[in-house]
Amino acid sequence: MNIELLRRPTRPTRRGLLALPLIGLLWMGVAAAPVGAAGSPTYRDCSQIALAPNADVHRCDLSDATIIGLDLHGIYASWSDLSRVNGGCDPDLPRTNLAGARIARAILVDAKLCDAILSDADLHGSDMSGVALEDASLNRANLSWTILSGSQAAFAPFVDANLSNATWRDGFANGATFDGADLHRIDFRGTDLRSASFVGSDLRYARLNGVDLTDADLTGANWRQATGLASATFSNTICPDGTNSDANGGTCAGH
């Protein structure tokens, strides 16, 4: 008699059964990951696509492109590489129009977007490290979960913008306007915020270690559970309750 035929089929072990769902979850995670998330980035061939209003250039390699003065309102450039894009940083040049642009989860490292119009743009989840945004218009823009470390945005208006959960460390936003902005859980550590305006802004749980708030206006801001106030610089700062830091022993903590 063939002994092999009498053997019971091998049952899967408990460990094997438990591993199957885990393998499935890992596969789903890989399948859902953005193109290029593992290994080198993969982009579409966009060589025949003209840069124009509402153009679809998502997942395109546009690094080092010059877009000074172009009207690109509503452009769709999510998941694209826009590193070192030159939108101009000369006030004598025409402004680049990116109003309402969709540039989510993109790479904009070291891009020059001074004076650019980015009002109502969706930039959430993008890497904007080292971006030049001086005098750019970012009113109502969505910058939640962005990385802005080292970026410079002196005198730029961010009125009613969403910067929740953004990381903006060791940057410059002196003279910028964040009135009415959602800044909850933002990481501002080490950033220059002199003369910035935060009237009515949401700064709950913000990380403010080492920030410079000299001459800043925090009237009506909500900074409940904000951290790092002990190491922040306050001088002639209008505190959330309307008092002046100089009258509070050089601090706005508790005010």
What are these regions (language model features)?
Residues 19-29:
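Bacterial N-terminal signal peptides
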Residues 33-255:
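Tandem repeat scaffolds
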Residues 1-12:
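N-terminal secretory signal peptides that target proteins for export/translocation
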Residues 15-16:
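Hydrophobic alpha-helical segments, especially transmembrane helices
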